[in-house]
């Protein structure tokens, strides 16, 4: 059986000066997506893709490593300034923000876009440990 020759699609380098970093920090994981102003994804990373498993994904250190990874990928596409949108109640919010600043981005705005229910769904019951 002959093998089909498929071309491997290379990532083209985009030249984007400003971007938006979406930091989604839940109780179990932290995901970072860096997009352009229109919302098209440039780079992304999460604590799970960095190799952390289980409860280690929810640590601030895992969020820091994921933010550094997404930031370095975005810098290859020419992103220099960022607006940061933070969402969720997790522990990786602050450390992901600090890591993005440490990579060398000029952060112009920080917005908290966590959805707040106006007496919507019933929350989960309290844990008894």
UniProtKB/Swiss-Prot annotation:
The keyword Ribosomal protein applies. One of its GO terms (cellular component) is ribosome. Keywords: Ribonucleoprotein, Ribosomal protein, RNA-binding, rRNA-binding. GO terms for biological process: translation. Located on the platform of the 30S subunit, it bridges several disparate RNA helices of the 16S rRNA. Forms part of the Shine-Dalgarno cleft in the 70S ribosome. Part of the 30S ribosomal subunit. Interacts with proteins S7 and S18. Binds to IF-3. This is Small ribosomal subunit protein uS11. It comes from Paracoccus denitrificans (strain Pd 1222).
């Amino acid at each position: 059986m002959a093998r089909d020759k498929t071309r491997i699609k290379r990532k083209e380098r985009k030249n984007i000066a400003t971007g938006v970093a979406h930091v989604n920090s839940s109780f179990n994981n932290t995901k970072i997506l860096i997009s352009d102003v229109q919302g098209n994804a440039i780079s992304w990373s999460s604590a799970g893709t960095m190799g952390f498993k289980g409860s280690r994904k929810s640590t601030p250190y895992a969020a820091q490593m994921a933010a550094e990874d997404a930031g370095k990928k975005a810098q290859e596409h020419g992103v220099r300034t960022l607006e940061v949108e933070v969402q969720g109640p997790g522990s990786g919010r602050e450390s992901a923000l600090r890591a993005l600043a440490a990579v060398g981005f000029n952060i112009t705005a920080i917005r908290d876009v966590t959805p707040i229910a106006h007496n919507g769904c019933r929350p989960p019951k309290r844990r008894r440990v």
